[in-house]
Amino acid sequence: MTDTLDLKLSSRRQWNPVRCPVRLEVDGSAQTPTSLVQTALNNPSFDLVIAAPNGQNVYIPFTEDRKLFTANIADDPSTSSLISHCHFEGVTEDGRHALSLCDPGEITGLLMTQTNRFGLSTSNNGSFVLIPYVENNCDLGSLVHSSSRKKRQIGKQNTVIDRNPSYIREHLDGRKRFVELALVADYSVYTKYDSDEKKVNDYMQQTMNILNSLYFPLNIRITLVHSEIWKKGDQISVIPDSKETLNNFMEYKKIMLKDHFFDTGYLMTTLKFDEGVVGKAYKGTMCSYDYSGGIYVDHNNDTVETVATFAHELGHTFGMDHDPNDKDVCYCPMPRCIMNPQSGHMEVWSECSVKNLASGFNRGIDLCLFNEPGKKPSDAKCGNGIVEPGEECDCGPLKCDNHCCNGSTCKLIGEAECASGDCCDLKTCKPKPRATVCRAAIGICDLDEYCNGETNDCPADFFVQNAALCPGKENEFCYEGGCGSRNDQCAKLWGPTGKNGDENCYRKNTEGTFHGNCGTNAHTKEIKKCETENAKCGLLQCETQAERPVFGDPGSVTFSHSTVYSSLKRDDKKFCYVFKSAYGGLNAPDPGLVPDGAICGEEQMCIGQKCHKKEKISKVTAQCLDNCNFRGVCNNVGNCHCERGFGGIACEIPGYGGSVNSNEAYRFRGITLSSTFLVFFCLFGIFIGGLCVYYRVKRKRNLVSEWWSVVKKKFDLHGDLVPVRKAPPPPYAQRIRQSFTAMWGEDHSHVAVAQPAHPRNCYNSCCRQPPRFDPPSIPMVTLKNPNLASPTPLLNPAEKEEQNQERATHQHVELYPVAESFRSDSAASFNTRTGSFRPNVQPPPVPRPSDDVLSKLNEDLAKEKNAKFDRLNKTLPLPPPLPKEKPKTASSTSLRRNESIRPEQAPPPPPPAHAKPTLPTKQPKVSEDAAATEEKVDVRSMAAIFDQKLKK
């Protein structure tokens, strides 16, 4: 979108020019700054003589330049009082000289010579000085010689001056073009000039005066048709980001276009942009509704240097690129030219800049530059076929068959909005819709142009960047909109069977004959011989099966063929067909020659029948950012022509395709790759969801579960098999105990309540007690049915009878102790508390080892732990004798089984008796499931099953 190499402040050393004192004279009288300003106010024209100390005298006739602004600005009540008629121009053989005499302290001028440029200003003592901008000397050069010419001869110089570089005359067509410019000064400029509106207007007109001197050699006239000064603050966001500021101003420019017509618009500011940027502009967008314009910084007190920055950015709008540093690639007659990437005193156009400008004119970038601004409507001639100021349309001198235009008044009819142009729909008399193709591509290296829906004109012609690969081709390059394909050119001349000839055929181009050459001189008709390095760029050598060419009129073409051999055996004969027509000339090459862009060596391509390095061509070609992110191609002015769905200078943002030069290519963004995937997955999800609902409702199947089962089985998916330990039951929770017959599938469970080891309210540290190890409790079995005998313990008949009688006398549920093991003749018994078998026979006693064995074990243990071991060989002393027993008294405590000896003193008094808690009168609640299970218990069958399992 924008110039990728912005104009930046020069990093070269500070320029310290000499100051050349001069004396100015008018009509033989010496002038002071005040008297010169007074002379300019009283005389619309005067002859100025510049006298240098070295005796050189220069004569320049100056005339007031009233074409710097149009009549609409002078007639505007808000600006007419601020227009100063103090800007003069003088035309000589060396160019256009500019002089502004609005204030004695602000005199500014630009004087041109063939080899130098001088700035005219005043010194502190009130005298005049010349400041050289190119050669640091005071030699006025060619100005001295031109002063000998007569006044009437100099005054007639109103066209391109002969002293301009020769390449300007070679590339430009000599037609004069007019640029209608809108210039806006932001609030920072207004404050810089003391918030004085008149000073700002004088400075803007002074800028236009010097700008016209710089564009005068190119035969381009720039006129200020609209100006604005933001006196109450900026109307847009002016920030250090130059790119964002440029985009903001382009949006504001569209608002200005609603009330004022102009070709391009620029914003002037004093704000310093990031990275030292002093100017930024869109490239190749002159006459564009959306992007014709730019911004620049008033960065220097020297007006000439600031205007050079303005001229640089305006050159980008014309399609000019930065000058390369290689003088062999791009010729510049002075050390620095205007399109140099670094700012400074640059007042000359390089050969590359002129070529870029001529290329833009050939593509129609100047379609809006032929109407002369300031021309009065009364000067227009209705019926001449040219839309002039004051006319809305002009359908020519003959009968007007355009129903959108009134041929007698040259006005639009009714609600018509346009009457001509490639983007005007003559059926509706309105601009064609946006993204309508108005100029189709004529080859693979050309690009389509589109209407923007706002204007009736088609954009200028743009094409693929020079030296870029032809789309879809290998080793064939684009140049000036054409593809350098030898095969395609041969097929164009000879039909479908035509293709590039053998490599040996091109050796004939060094002979300079009809069968091989590098073209013919258009003036002398002399056949030119190719140099050896250019042999592949001369006459196109084709291979075909056709008898004659299919291109051109038979009377205007000539063809022939020759024979070559690729080996010494002469058994592989090749035919080389050549073509010559009368269609070639000065401006168009002969179609029988090798097309520009054809490969002629490694990283080399043909241009103008000469083989050039591709790198040399790329140096003078505008480059695109980031290779357009592989979403488009780079056009000839360095802007990306994007695919559908993308936009921006590098196709990095969503957009409508196309480019800022060719306009948007589509009316809607279309479906991008990301949106395609999004829509696909959404539709797929809806389909799967509907299918699952259908199977769930209609066929009672869960497709998700079935699919997941198949996936787990197919890919062997499973979770981590980590055993999970069950948490212990909470306090006072019911604990279910299984019967020992549960392992055989007979579960006789009962429910018991676990009592806490500590009081419920002991949670604080003060209530904590040391652990207490109680003896194991006796398992209890709850029996509800008194008619069923307890499975344990096994009782003899007498005990069973006593037990039955006791059950008969008690009606409530009782708890019976369960023995730890069965009293049977079996080898082992089952422990209902621990759930394990224990042997019924006591284990044999283990005898105590002897003292020697124990001593040996202790010694080994001491060695293992590196401890000292002392063997005791001495006899241990005998224990003291027991005290004699005293005779028993009445108060003495008798021994019980000689287990302990009571102390002689009386025992302490017993603790006070506490009332025992009353037993609950309500019977404990027993689970109904457990009761139901107990009713089915059969002790005999259980014992039989148990014995059977033990036998196995």
Swiss-Prot record:
Bias-annotated ranges (Pro residues): 905-914
Species classification: Eukaryota, Metazoa, Ecdysozoa, Nematoda, Chromadorea
Name the record gives this protein: Disintegrin and metalloproteinase domain-containing protein adm-2
Residues modified by glycosylation: N125, N301, N406
Biased composition (Basic and acidic residues): 798-809, 849-873, 925-938
Keywords: Cell membrane, Disulfide bond, EGF-like domain, Endosome, Glycoprotein, Hydrolase, Lysosome, Membrane, Metal-binding, Metalloprotease, Protease, Transmembrane, Transmembrane helix, Zinc
A Gene Ontology cellular-component term: endosome membrane
Entry-linked CDD domains: ZnMc_adamalysin_II_like (cd04269)
EC category: hydrolase
Keyword Cell membrane annotated: yes
Domain EGF-like, residue spans: 620-652
Cofactor: Zn(2+)
Knockout or disruption consequences: RNAi-mediated knockdown leads to suppression of molting defects in a nekl-2(fd81);nekl-3(gk894345) double mutant background.
